[in-house]
């Protein structure tokens, strides 16, 4: 089994009204009142990571010999490296909402939030430990969709590949990150010799001199969901960072709950050099 998303969810709560509960586990549910479930996420999508890289480089040079003993070289180098990476990630609020499945009036599995948009869903240990719900094991905040709008697709966690394609599509999202690195280099070099002071030196005076200008920049743009930006369809205000809604939360695509940022930078430098050769000794 291959999946780009490899991880596991620990201490997921299965409630007694979950219609996907296997009959073999019903006696345990009747005795305890709930189940604690651990699940690897290997069968929730089959999307691999994709990387597209493109390098463009233009180099030009010119050599000029103003006289027999002097040469001037000019060179310019312009390069751009672009990378686009795509990977699939689980959206935590959607996953927990899809896991919190009940039966509707006709006995069909549905998300609890479709019947009660104010319902709080249970989260697992890792999300709790990293402050997903501000300290509790339940959350009533839906960040990437609006509960009750019919989007939520119930997820069957029991068995390999038990989750329906609709549930897989609902709980996952394709994320795109883009990186661009640009470089510009310009240099001029002159070398030659002067046949002077012949009575004092054992040959002509040689020289080499030059100047180089270098400008480099990079720009790394993360997917808005990776940045914790609330998407269209959220039950809150789209386009704002999730921490403005829940101050304890910075993202909803991983357990880390670490705020991510776009990064960029640039620098330029100018180097000048000069050398001289004096043939003092024969």
Predicted region positions:
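Surface-exposed, low-complexity loop segments enriched in small/polar and acidic residues
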Residues: 1-269
